[in-house]
């Protein structure tokens, strides 16, 4: 039958689409204004689109003869929970698809909430689908090109020639703290940017063997950025931008008794607990579907699995343990050893907002390890109330969705980010 060879599937919409190679077992989907899966046959002919937002199992589509052309819950031995599962995933966006190598009609689709894609578009400077163009006056005019990309008009930066640093510094012999203000051009108060206030303490210098005065050592005592990570704000055009007052030094408006000037930790948009409590709404989902283009019930939903972030942190990678000092004098790196990483994706210095309030307490006075102790561990970022243990990482949706993917079929098992779902 013809449907034995019709096993190509792509994703795309309008003029943007990606053809799926039937010889491969997975393909990357593209996201645009409307999100749908596009079905192709081996000859490269587009057969139809599967737009989850427009499919309703309660009102199946019928042709002119009254025959049901789409019945997602008929045939293929589906479970009785399929209607409820469909309502949980119909408003989510497909971002990746993998074809079962043992069954040309069985596909696994990775779905994420639509708000996650919108947030990613905002981070990249892309406009939302319903966002109109915005324009200002004079040199501040902006244009919105394809896919809402905002591009500023090219203009010469005349302020670079007279750019200078102005500020106030106070120093003392036993310790010092400085607060500086950077101003471009030195004329307008609106261009002033508050610098981070960093308190340091100096150690007395030591003399070398030849009697020379030793170098003065300065070590970090506290850092406002570690205690109050950067917030993200949005203007009328929904552009994510950094504000000068977003370092958490402003008085707390929650009425919890926070003193003026005390840093208020940045709160993630969604915490691990929120995603865990409502995975149908906030979590990523895996949809297993059957699609036979020339069958009467061509598409059917097999099962739906929601990816719980707590399950991810409990099962993959192997451990959140802090790395140990090995016999080579190097730190053993594991995928989940994020508390000490300064270059990796899970990085408390690069993304301090991924750590809950109270976890971003840097221990800068202790080196944390001893070369003579092979079992020594470094605390790095730790909780104030439980300083003898390493702090677990919080996994809000930025880190959660950024590390989900790589759908791979292994015999009858489906692997997503190393987690076996079946």
UniProtKB/Swiss-Prot annotation:
Bias-annotated ranges (Low complexity):
170-199, 262-271
State what protein this is by name.
Answer: Uncharacterized protein MPN_502
A Pfam family matched in the record: P1_N
Give the residues annotated as coiled coil: none
Give the similarity note: Belongs to the adhesin P1 family.
Top-rank taxon: Bacteria
Region entry Disordered, spans: 1-21, 158-218, 246-271
Which cysteines share a disulfide bond? none
For bias type Polar residues, the affected ranges are 11-21, 205-216, 250-261
Naturally occurring in which organism (per UniProt):
Mycoplasma pneumoniae (strain ATCC 29342 / M129 / Subtype 1) (Mycoplasmoides pneumoniae)
């Amino acid at each position: 039958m013809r449907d034995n060879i019709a096993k190509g599937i792509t994703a795309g919409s309008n003029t943007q689409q990606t053809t799926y190679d039937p010889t491969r077992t997975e393909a990357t989907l593209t996201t645009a204004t409307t999100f749908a899966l596009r079905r192709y046959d081996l000859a490269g002919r587009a057969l139809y689109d599967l737009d989850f937002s427009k499919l309703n199992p309660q009102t199946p589509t019928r042709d002119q003869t009254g025959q049901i052309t789409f019945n997602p819950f008929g045939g293929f031995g589906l479970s009785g929970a399929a209607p409820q599962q469909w309502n949980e995933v119909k408003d989510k966006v497909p971002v990746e698809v993998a074809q079962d190598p043992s069954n040309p009609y069985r596909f696994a689709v990775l779905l994420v909430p639509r708000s996650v894609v919108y947030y990613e578009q905002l981070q990249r400077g892309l406009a939302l689908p319903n966002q109109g163009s915005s324009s200002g006056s004079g040199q501040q005019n902006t244009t919105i090109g394809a896919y809402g990309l905002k591009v500023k008009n090219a203009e010469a930066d005349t302020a670079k020639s007279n750019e200078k640093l102005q500020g106030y510094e106070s120093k003392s012999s036993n310790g010092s703290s400085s607060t500086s203000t950077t101003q471009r051009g030195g004329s307008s108060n609106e261009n002033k940017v508050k610098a981070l206030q960093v308190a340091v303490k100096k150690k007395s210098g030591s003399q070398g063997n030849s009697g020379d005065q030793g170098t003065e050592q300065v070590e970090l005592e506290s850092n406002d950025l570690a205690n109050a990570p950067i917030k993200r704000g949005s203007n009328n055009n929904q552009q994510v931008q950094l504000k000068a007052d977003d370092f958490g030094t402003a008085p707390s408006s929650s009425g919890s008794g926070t003193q003026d000037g005390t840093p208020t930790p940045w709160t993630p948009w969604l915490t691990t607990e929120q995603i865990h409590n409502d995975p149908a709404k906030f979590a990523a989902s895996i949809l297993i579907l059957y699609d036979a283009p020339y069958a009467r019930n061509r598409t059917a939903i097999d099962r739906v699995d929601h990816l719980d972030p707590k399950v991810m942190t409990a099962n993959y990678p192997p451990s959140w343990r802090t790395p140990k000092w090995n016999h080579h004098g190097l730190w053993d790196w594991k995928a989940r050893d994020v508390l000490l990483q300064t270059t990796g994706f899970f990085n408390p210095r690069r993304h301090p907002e991924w750590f809950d309030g109270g976890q971003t307490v840097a221990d800068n006075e202790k080196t944390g390890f001893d070369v003579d102790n092979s079992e020594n561990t470094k605390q790095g970022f730790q909780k104030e109330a439980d300083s003898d243990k390493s702090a677990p990482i919080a996994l809000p949706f930025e880190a959660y969705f950024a590390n989900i993917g790589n759908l791979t079929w292994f015999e009858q098992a489906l692997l997503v980010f190393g987690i076996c779902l079946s």
